[in-house]
Amino acid sequence: MSYNSIYDIIGLNNEVNRLETQAKLGWSKEFRALKWLGLKDGMKILDVGSGPGSYTELLLENLPNSEITGLEIDKNLLSIAKDRLKDYPSERLNFKYGSILNSGLKENSFDFIICRFVYQHLEKPLAATREIYKLLKPGGIVAIIDSDRGLYGVSEPDILFKSGRGFISQIERRAKWNREIGRKLLKILKYEGFD
């Protein structure tokens, strides 16, 4: 994993704020897309890379009969998520410390797995996909949401966007993120047996 080095650059509080904003900005469109893919209330859901719990909280609020497990490799973010969502009963919400590569979660446990902006940090995306496949119940669904810097689609970026991209590129290089993972996801999924 290459995630923690972002703290050296922007600090934990700024990273939590960034993740909170990221979760809220795309929520309405993402939630519609997740429902279109088959997400339904009452499902058992795994949120891989649950971070500070921002997205997990949105899932809990919009799926009141679902049981959600947040899996997070970063102890700082996991602690923030647990504190933030401590009022939810354990029948609805569980958090697990660990990587998707060795989660310790029971195979065939989840109806729906959501993996948002995690693959760009993975050194072994094929192994992660293999583990996700094992964790899904038969007929289960995985939704991988990630980025690809080649798909931004801004025809004439303004000066602020250009300067922001320079800063983001610095973070990407230092953290060794794979910001072109989006174009590889379909091949990875097919290779690991997803239809």
Locate the predicted segments by residue:
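Class I SAM-dependent methyltransferase Rossmann-like catalytic core
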Residues: 3-27
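Conserved catalytic/acceptor-binding region of the Class I
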Residues: 143-195
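A short SAM/SAH-binding and catalytic strip from SAM-dependent methyltransferases
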Residues: 111-125
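Conserved alpha-helix/loop element of class I SAM-dependent methyltransferases that forms part
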Residues: 24-41, 58
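A short glycine-rich, Lys/Arg-flanked "PGG" loop and its adjoining helix->strand segment in the class I
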Residues: 126-141
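Class I SAM-dependent methyltransferase SAM/SAH-binding core
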Residues: 46, 52-102
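A short acidic, Gly/Pro-enriched loop at the edge of an enzyme's catalytic core
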Residues: 101-112
